[in-house]
Each structure stands twice: as structure tokens, then as C-alpha cells.
Amino acid sequence: MSEKNAYAKSGVDVEAGYEVVERIKKHVARTERAGVMGALGGFGGMFDLSKTGVREPVLVSGTDGVGTKLMLAIKYQQHDTIGQDCVAMCVNDIIAAGAEPLYFLDYVATGKNEPAKLEQVVAGVAEGCVQAGAALIGGETAEMPGMYGEDDYDLAGFAVGVAEKSQIIDGSKVKEGDILLGLASSGIHSNGYSLVRRVFADYTGNEVLPELEGKQLKDVLLEPTRIYVKAVLPLIKEELVNGIAHITGGGFIENVPRMFADDLAAEIDEDKVPVLPIFNAIEKYGDIKHEEMFEIFNMGVGLMLAVSPENVNRVKELLDEPVYEIGRIIKKADDSVVIK
């Protein structure tokens, strides 16, 4: 028995792994940007930081996955956008620190290497990288029979960006009186899906619920996470933003306080939050307390900015999209987030 056959009998298909690499090359090529060194397939991805033109560079890194949203992608056999979710979760975190994404690496683990399916996953990663302006410079595809079922896979990503040292956003500039501006989310994004799956456990995904404006449930649930990089970078370059909060797991309650000091609080006007229909559906069909929704989901605001009042108009001008004035920064009395 050859070594190859022995490995195949243990459940690992080396040839399928080679096929995946060949299939994804064209998708990786879409993400090329200045600074990338070397070709796909090396032991390590290389990037020339001098190509960024940043005078005092500070590297900012982030890693994340997409949680159990993956289980819906597997259930509905829609694998082409879940990679964008993975990129978004990472790059939106580092843009919140004032960093421009430079490069990205992905990690896919599966029970059985299916080249066509994994190509779809990586194509989604590449699309996310294009939207973020980041190069996909490396990754790993691990076939792990016995660890995962044949149809199962997990996905994680790693983003590295650069910030000008003087433009780092760390919460120190947020002050009482700052205006809170909300940027719209595209949907649920990539958190809260353990609850979402419970709420819709008995649904096929093909339903068109009255709350969802004619869309099938599965399409709304798998709507890819918005990537905010290209919208927000110009604001950072002009130093118009004092704080940024990426609204992920924990919703408003956990994420908004991460962008300011402990002696401050956020006062949110609920009537000004552009709540998306899917959140009304989740609340209704899941019989969830209204206030708890803000502790779990983004509620229609995926990124929140703290901006000095005199800069609000310029920020709106640069964003060129609907911007929601949903609150302000106040002195903390009790809670870090007050929803009125």
C-alpha cells in the first residue's frame, strides 16, 4: 500500500487539496495590492510596509470567525458569501482603531475537502478583501476527518492593518457632547445566530414573512456583513472621528462603551435607530423582550461614530449615504448606555 493510499484511506484527499489551491488562485489574484511580496503557496505571506507611505506606522491586527451563521450556510447550501462575513468581522474591528487593512489570511477546516464548495467559500473571502482593500496573502485549508462531519466546515480569518500613529482611535478623544452617528448595517451581520437559529428552527428558509418586504427568509439571514472600510477611511484621514464602535456580539450595550472612557456614557434615542425588518421579525417570532434585542443585535446600525458637533456636517458630506444621528455622549451617572 502506498503512503498516498494509506492517507486517503484515513479520509484525507491530498489531490482534492491541490485542486482547491488551483481553483482559488484566480480569486486571490483579485485582491492584489501594493506591498504584496511573493506568490501564493509560500510558507509565509510577505508585505512591504514601506509601500503604504505611512510616516509612523502602527500595525493593528484582528481575528474573528462568523459563529453559527456557518450552520445556516451549510443548511441552505449557500457558501459564496460567508467568506465576506469573515473578512468583515475582522476588518471592521481594525478600522475601529483607525487602521487601514493591508492583508488578510483565512483558515478553513472541514471534514471532507470538496473543491467546488471551498472555492465558493474562498471566493467570498476574496470579495470581502476587495471591498476592504486588503490582499489575501495566505491561508490554510485543513481536512480533518473525525473532527468534523463530511458536510461541515469552520472558517476564521486574520486581518492586519496600519494606522498613522497620530491617527490611532483608542477612545481617548471622545468627550461629553460628541454626537453619535450610526451607519446602517446590511442585516444581522455575523452575531446572534445561535438565537436566530432557535427562533427559525422550524422554517425551511424559503418562507416570505410579511415583515421581510418580499424577500425569502434564508436570503435575509445570509445577507453578508457590510464592510465599512472604504466609507470610514476618509474620515480617519481627515481626523474627523473621535471614536468608532463596531456593533457585534453584545449589541449596543456591550460594544458602544468600548469606544470611550469609563466616566462617559452614550445616550441613544431609540426612535432614531433605523431598525431593520429582520429584527422586528426576530423579536416577534422569538418572543424576545424588546430591550434585550439591543443587548444582542446591531438593530440596523453596524458601526457607530462619535464625532465633535462641528464636524458632523463634514462627516455626512464625505460619507454620501444615509447617516443617523442617534444620540450623544454624556457624563456617566449609572449605565454606560442609556436608551431612551
From Swiss-Prot:
Catalytic activity: 2-formamido-N(1)-(5-O-phospho-beta-D-ribosyl)acetamidine + ATP = 5-amino-1-(5-phospho-beta-D-ribosyl)imidazole + ADP + phosphate + H(+)
Keyword Lipid metabolism among UniProt keywords: no
Enzyme class name: ligase
GO cellular component: cytosol
GO BP, sorted A to Z: 'de novo' IMP biosynthetic process; adenine biosynthetic process
Gene Ontology MF term list: ATP binding; phosphoribosylamine-glycine ligase activity; phosphoribosylformylglycinamidine cyclo-ligase activity
Pathway named in the protein's UniProt entry: Purine metabolism; IMP biosynthesis via de novo pathway; 5-amino-1-(5-phospho-D-ribosyl)imidazole from N(2)-formyl-N(1)-(5-phospho-D-ribosyl)glycinamide: step 2/2
Keywords, sorted A to Z: ATP-binding, Cytoplasm, Ligase, Nucleotide-binding, Purine biosynthesis
Enzyme Commission numbers on file: 6.3.3.1
Localization terms from the record: Cytoplasm
Domain of life: Bacteria
Keyword match Ligase: yes
Family classification: Belongs to the AIR synthase family.
Name this protein carries in UniProt: Phosphoribosylformylglycinamidine cyclo-ligase
Species whose genome carries this gene: Streptococcus agalactiae serotype Ia (strain ATCC 27591 / A909 / CDC SS700)
